[in-house]
Amino acid sequence: MSSVLPTPVLPTPGKNINRGHFPDDFIFGAGTSSYQIEGAAREGGRGPSIWDTFTHTHPELIQDGSNGDTAVNSYNLYKEDIKIVKLMGLDAYRFSISWPRILPGGSINAGINQEGIKYYNNLIDELLANDIVPYVTLFHWDVPQALQDQYDGFLSDKIVDDFRDFAELCFWEFGDRVKNWITINEPQSYSDFFGVAYDTPPKAHALKASRLLVPTTVARPSKPARVFASTADPGTTTADQVYKVGHNLLLAHAAALKVYRDNFQDTQEGTFGMALVTQWMKPLNENNPADVEAASRAFDFKFGWFMQPLITGEYPKSMRQSLGPRLREFTRDQKKLLIGSYDYVGVNYYTATYVSSARPPNDNKAIFHTDGNFYTTDCKDGVLIGPLAGPAWLNIVPEGIYRCLQEIKAKYNNPVIYITENGVYEVNDTTKTLSEARVDTTRVDYLQDHLSYVLKARQQGVRVQGYFVWSLMDNWELRAGYTSRFGLIHVDYYNNFARYPKDSAIWFRNAFHKRLRIHVNKRPQEDDGAFDTPRKRLKK
């Protein structure tokens, strides 16, 4: 049985960390994404996305067979959700715009959905009316099914123009009020879905929108969606397609920035970045040069893949050496667009892994990454790199966020950074009472410890300027459905999606409320007891 490494000594201030330890202009917020929270899949003129097709066609590949048809109904409860953000005293709220809600047919030529425009205008206006800054993601993986049908989505160069047009429409409609944009969320994760993960879209790239019948919304989220019989081959993908998708994501990002800087920058004065996922790639044997090199190579395949082109217009050397002609070249004009196409870097960090150049002895769980020629594992000599948050994948390693920030500073010219996602999940235990379900000590500890390491990185010169918890509320998790909960706010999936603050939400409010900008030991005024009452629902 695996044991766990002892918890490292936390940097000061450790468990007492709060807003006063950070500069006044440091941004604290929480994030969500459209498909995971909005629901209203067939309301307001929205068209289907690849996730709609996938979850209805392959419910067996979602852990509980559910889908995002209703998600957590934020489309209809957005004012309540914004009230929560205000009660918590957060500076900012990160959300994504649903491409098929704005452009149901995917392209401008197929028509603009004014109801979708109105929804996001209302959301943005409500945020600003409550002194909350919007941070808006343009693409959080919900490709319009229409574009997947027409030309296989991001497998085709054609999507670059359609994404540019979608982005331009968003700048035109919302850019007078939105000053902080994230073009693409986790392009590495999305690209890898083509060749690594068989159980996610765009596995469904061969499925046509005509097969997305309009089923009745699932009444109880734990029940699977209806299954529609089909003889269509869902299709498989090659490893080369992973890099083609990544290439087009980078070009789409650059095209969106070009249209903004050419047409909107002078009047709107917005800032841009991509949200890139990272892990601490810890050498299995730090005294073995081959393992150290393998860990560096793993970081390139995870983070450098999308960061290096923004610096030099080239992919990381280790990727070029490993992949050769399988990795496409950028043209001279494309390099010009890519270099410097960011104002800040979004960093999504959750966990860490060991990396080795050879298969670790007596480790049957080690995963070999063929293209990068390295192994990853969460275990060394029978000891886990960090405790597991649940049954899979998220080992809790707070030091890892510090190590990643230091590596980004050293390798990529010390860019301005926002932690755009950081959080931990608990398993959705349906046997717990509401009061029990809202006790999330693991999350409080996780956030305290990671924020302490973020502060340490800042004190050592890393230019971190903001931190967003993932996520504001429990939501429909991609692949996991309703089986895991990432939220500061508990959502009752079975009783009209009622929202209740967890212990972590109350802790975060008391430690990081915007009123605490001046004094380390100051607490927010208890102006709204409803939030601090442990068993009271947050009202509309």
From Swiss-Prot:
The active site is at E186 (proton donor), E421 (nucleophile). It catalyses: deacetylipecoside + H2O = deacetylipecoside aglycone + D-glucose; deacetylisoipecoside + H2O = deacetylisoipecoside aglycone + D-glucose. The record marks W393 as: Controls the gate shape and acceptance of substrates. It is an enzyme of class 3 (hydrolase). InterPro entries: Glyco_hydro_1, Glyco_hydro_1_N_CS, Glycoside_hydrolase_SF. Disulfide bonds: none annotated. Signal peptide: none annotated. GO terms for cellular component: cytosol. Gene3D superfamilies: Glycosidases. Its EC number is 3.2.1.-. Keywords: Alkaloid metabolism, Cytoplasm, Glycosidase, Hydrolase. Its main location: cytoplasm. GO terms for biological process: glucan catabolic process; isoquinoline alkaloid biosynthetic process. GO terms for molecular function: beta-glucosidase activity. Pathway: Alkaloid biosynthesis. A beta-D-glucoside binds at Q36, H140, N185, E186, Y350, E421, W470, F486. It comes from the Eukaryota. It is found in: Cytoplasm, Cytosol. Beta-glucosidase catalyzing deglucosylation on N-deacetylisoipecoside and N-deacetylipecoside. Belongs to the glycosyl hydrolase 1 family. This is Ipecac alkaloid beta-glucosidase 9. It comes from Carapichea ipecacuanha (Ipecac). The gene is GLU9.
